[in-house]
Amino acid sequence: MSTADALDDENTFKILVATDIHLGFMEKDAVRGNDTFVTLDEILRLAQENEVDFILLGGDLFHENKPSRKTLHTCLELLRKYCMGDRPVQFEILSDQSVNFGFSKFPWVNYQDGNLNISIPVFSIHGNHDDPTGADALCALDILSCAGFVNHFGRSMSVEKIDISPVLLQKGSTKIALYGLGSIPDERLYRMFVNKKVTMLRPKEDENSWFNLFVIHQNRSKHGSTNFIPEQFLDDFIDLVIWGHEHECKIAPTKNEQQLFYISQPGSSVVTSLSPGEAVKKHVGLLRIKGRKMNMHKIPLHTVRQFFMEDIVLANHPDIFNPDNPKVTQAIQSFCLEKIEEMLENAERERLGNSHQPEKPLVRLRVDYSGGFEPFSVLRFSQKFVDRVANPKDIIHFFRHREQKEKTGEEINFGKLITKPSEGTTLRVEDLVKQYFQTAEKNVQLSLLTERGMGEAVQEFVDKEEKDAIEELVKYQLEKTQRFLKERHIDALEDKIDEEVRRFRETRQKNTNEEDDEVREAMTRARALRSQSEESASAFSADDLMSIDLAEQMANDSDDSISAATNKGRGRGRGRRGGRGQNSASRGGSQRGRADTGLETSTRSRNSKTAVSASRNMSIIDAFKSTRQQPSRNVTTKNYSEVIEVDESDVEEDIFPTTSKTDQRWSSTSSSKIMSQSQVSKGVDFESSEDDDDDPFMNTSSLRRNRR
């Protein structure tokens, strides 16, 4: 687009483009806690000052999948401050909005809502940090969409086939087909592209008159054989691709010579990892589109915290460092000190005249100490810069360059290997699980479960806090294996069962689509179980509170009545306290309601725990046994019902210990009863609470009761 065409008129779209804001990153840090909020304020202010038609976000608006109340509140506050007003919106929507926003309860663009006064619409896809999760598949963007501040588009409702329907925009004579695809696991999306399961729909009328703009949030650089999306997978009719997820700022559009479209990679607006890609200056883009022509003007962000990074190799300075010198460590420290001082001077020099930039910069010095050198204490060294840098704990990163064996194929990027990932973009949980089982010994290999399924379950457990994900996957694959063995009518011999299980597992591993269905079904079960647990927990807590309140009220009434009778009979000798025997009895009597309530609650808890334990101990061989051979659970319930009848002296011994002889006799009686109660408990599948917190396979409801 020429300079004359770039002039704003009624036919020119002005779009502010940004990605990977990661709102709420390190919000609890005393120094860096407000960095993301300040930068979002600057981005929205730039949109208002440049009078853009709308804001386009490429995913990862939030850093956490479940952002905190502070993060959500600040985001809503800033969106209301800058995006609401009386300035009219100059473009219109031509496409069917019920298709573009069909997953929303309000399937229309927010500025056309009669109850809202929007001056700058915000269009956004979701990223891998704020993607939909849970039984209802909701994400943080859905909250903003329901509130009317963000238009969430590009969401795929199917995991088997994706049809991307564009949002059709028109301003004057300029028409834009806005395509969006929210974050999907790269391996799955890669396979869908290979199998021709991704379709980008085009307008039926005069399709060549539209400017095709595509927003995607996936790995662009190659992290594995299928753990990225090649640019060649995208359709060649696209004019411009806004690529999110990659944090290095490459906002200037570059042309793909094979597909003949342009790619703009805005990068993140906040430093989330101390890696070389984050050291590039941060920008947002002001995109102008007129007809089929475009112009991208990059705008530097002035509120981003400075980040300086430098690498040194000790072996490259033989004149300064000798590993045989006993004082070589002091020499290395002095050399590192000089390098850091130089970076701090550069930071102070660049910060002159910019009052909006944070005072303390981020500094990272990577030291290659291969060649016989030894690292020094980083914590002690960092104490010198506590008041001068924002990351005093990890200023220096020591690494050793190890020689790799010669391999055929592409070279290994050692820069990525030595960079410590901090947000899971280069090192993922499921890859670690897969790598572990591939290199593990034969006796610890999985024989029933699959590596892929376990990797997905562990990822859900770690990243999305789905505490039942691992347990439900194990249950689902176990049930499926049991059904397979029953259908084959295998003899109940351990050797034959093991052989059939291995054969069945290999068959499932080859069928990747079936394995994906298994993982999805298990995750759906886990999310549904979490929702049911939360509802039952809230109802259970309400019942407990009511029973405790009633018990306390009955206890207080009992105390008052007994105390009144005591005062009347004994006169002034004991006052309100009453006699020892009566007082002791009244206390025991007043606690009767509490004792009954607590024991009933404990009984319910133990019975539920027994049921869970019984289901967990279910093995494959048990599937061939008749249900009549299984022990009845009524016996256990009967034992507990006998334990419920406890004299009030048991509770008195635990709550109000005394030293009188009578109380000592009660104490011995109570001790014997408590021992008998514990013996009955040991007769059931009793689980110690010491290891429950570390057990990811434990039921969520059991964990909640143990924490009480």
Swiss-Prot record:
SUPFAM superfamilies, per database record: Metallo-dependent phosphatases
Region (Disordered): 507-540, 556-614, 651-708
Biased composition (Polar residues): 599-614, 698-708
Compositional bias annotation for Basic residues: 569-579
GO cellular component: BRCA1-C complex; chromosomal region; chromosome, telomeric region; cytoplasm; cytosol; Mre11 complex; nucleoplasm; nucleus
Cross-link type Glycyl lysine isopeptide (Lys-Gly) (interchain with G-Cter in SUMO), residue numbers: 384, 467
Record cross-link Glycyl lysine isopeptide (Lys-Gly) (interchain with G-Cter in UFM1), residues: 282
Positions with a binding annotation for Mn(2+) 1: 20, 22, 60, 247
Localisation per UniProt entry: Nucleus; Chromosome; Chromosome, Telomere
Oligomer status and interactors: Component of the MRN complex composed of two heterodimers RAD50 and MRE11 associated with a single NBN. The MRN complexes dimerize on DNA to form joined MRN-MRN oligomers required for DNA double-strand break repair. As part of the MRN complex, interacts with MCM9; the interaction recruits the complex to DNA repair sites. Component of the BASC complex, at least composed of BRCA1, MSH2, MSH6, MLH1, ATM, BLM, RAD50, MRE11 and NBN. Found in a complex with TERF2. Interacts with DCLRE1C/Artemis and DCLRE1B/Apollo. Interacts with ATF2. Interacts with EXD2. Interacts with MRNIP.
Designated name of the protein: Double-strand break repair protein MRE11
Source species: Homo sapiens (Human)
